[in-house]
Amino acid sequence: MGAFALFAVLAMAVTMAVAEQCGSQAGGATCPNCLCCSRFGWCGSTSDYCGDGCQSQCAGCGGGGTPVTPTPTPSGGGGVSSIVSRALFDRMLLHRNDGACQAKGFYTYDAFVAAAGAFPGFGTTGSTDTRKREVAAFLAQTSHETTGGWATAPDGAFAWGYCFKQERGATSNYCTPSAQWPCAPGKSYYGRGPIQLSHNYNYGPAGRAIGVDLLRNPDLVATDPTVSFKTAMWFWMTAQAPKPSSHAVITGQWSPSGTDRAAGRVPGFGVITNIVNGGIECGHGQDSRVADRIGFYKRYCDILRVGYGNNLDCYNQRPFA
């Protein structure tokens, strides 16, 4: 064997011994310096990395590629139903079926569990406390997005999550011209479902990830409860550069970069709010919307009997670029 061939084999062996750097193989991490993430979880800038199967930053940090949902190794402690029973679900989302709620009868426990089954890492990663915090954080963020509560509401404002299933009074079709995710004629991409999925550039990749054409059928997010929950879980589980996935944050798989730390973005529930709506809610001191998200989170953690963790707000965090 020639010296060059021997070097190549040794280099390959060293490479294989190092953990993957990005994408689904690395908890949804993105590559530094706008490099592409290959289908195999490695960073680079050639067609081997940026071509077919590229997971993120396929055209640099300006876009390209389809965000990939990470599927971390489950802890082996059972599915999400082992963390949240039907009775607990009903207690947490106490007034979702109130007669005044637009979504009455829509958000069912069975749909929640079925959707979670399509994302094996959701609510199954890490210790029991980590799993509980993930479910609490997910339901808190989505409860804020769909809340029907008010300050003097029966049982408190934080008992009224999941009251709405679609945006009220939408005045835009939320269509951004895109060759990759073209809008269908006559369709609107306003907020729907638990996370209030908006814009064609989110409906497109969400639909591809769950196997449904949501560009042509966006109303499914407000008419099929399992599809609805799946879109929210897709958003939760999927890193979109430069943001990590909410799942990676709450399960402790995200390590903030120096840039993140300089911006005040450190692990905790607060950075998830930054991921969801940081451009509007974070970085300018106290904000009632951030406080509302925290209120839901604390209530759900209390019901699940788990600690809140640190860094709950994003008042002093700069939004992700």
Swiss-Prot record:
Record-linked PROSITE patterns: CHIT_BIND_I_1, CHIT_BIND_I_2, CHITINASE_19_1, CHITINASE_19_2
Keyword Transcription regulation: no
Signal peptide positions on this chain: 1-19
Protein name in UniProt: Basic endochitinase A
Superkingdom field: Eukaryota
Region Catalytic: start-end pairs: 80-321
A single Gene Ontology CC term: extracellular region
Keyword terms of this UniProt record: Antimicrobial, Carbohydrate metabolism, Chitin degradation, Chitin-binding, Disulfide bond, Fungicide, Glycosidase, Hydrolase, Plant defense, Polysaccharide degradation, Signal
GO biological process terms, semicolon-separated: cell wall macromolecule catabolic process; chitin catabolic process; defense response to fungus; killing of cells of another organism; polysaccharide catabolic process
Tissues in which the protein is found: Localized in the aleurone cells of the seed endosperm (at protein level).
pH effect on activity, per entry: Optimum pH is about 5.0. Stable between pH 4-8.
Catalytic activity: Random endo-hydrolysis of N-acetyl-beta-D-glucosaminide (1->4)-beta-linkages in chitin and chitodextrins
Residue intervals of the Chitin-binding type-1 domain: 20-60
PANTHER family, alphabetized: CHITINASE (PTHR22595:SF118), CHITINASE-RELATED (PTHR22595)
Entry's family note: Belongs to the glycosyl hydrolase 19 family. Chitinase class I subfamily.
Cited SUPFAM superfamilies: Lysozyme-like, Plant lectins/antimicrobial peptides
Role played: Defense against chitin-containing fungal pathogens. Binds the hyphal tips, lateral walls and septa of fungi and degrades mature chitin.
Pfam families: Chitin_bind_1 (PF00187), Glyco_hydro_19 (PF00182)
Species lineage: Eukaryota, Viridiplantae, Streptophyta, Embryophyta, Tracheophyta
Active site feature: E145
